[in-house]
Amino acid sequence: MQELAIYGGTRVIQPEEVRSWPPVDKSDEELVLDALYAKNQTRGKHNLELEKEFAAWNGNSHALFTNSGTAALHMCIAGCGIGAGDHVLVTAYSWSSSATCILHHDALPIFIDIDFDTFLIDPDKIEAAITPRTRAIIVVQLHGLCADMDAVNAIAAKHNLYVIEDACQAHGATYKGR
């Protein structure tokens, strides 16, 4: 057996073949320095421009950037008025924040099984988990795929529930042409 390159064996990929990504040039450096020295780093011109472009790219009129998907989920939970004793339906097949953000607001995550073809929330499993304390459904869009939002939204409307879409792992995904 040949020795691994890390232990002195022959390299398969030469150092000059390794490219850094993304490529960084002088204009990138200038933009970073401009942002670092700005008086308003969180709502500065670069943030506002990017929010506007991102909203347009998604076919929306507004976008609000946060430092993480976790922070965005906290904002959604708080914005829906979810709190102590409330239930929020979510899949366990996700980043932990999809459930822990619920706990941080003193609510209880209720785990819904996934569709094993898509690894997304299975709408057929949602209604059985709804209780009088259920306030919302967090739909986690993964791997560039979208859950069956027609079914999820119909169930949510029937039971007067909020729908929160966690699309941190599906930017640019489309559902029925949108």
Write out the residue ranges for each language-model feature:
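PLP-dependent aminotransferase-like
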Residues: 78-167, 174
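Conserved PLP-binding active-site segment in aminotransferase class I/II-type PLP enzymes
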Residues: 1-79, 83, 150, 157
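Active-site-adjacent capping/gating segments
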Residues: 170, 177-178
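Compositionally biased, intrinsically disordered low-complexity segments enriched
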Residues: 5, 43, 143-145, 171
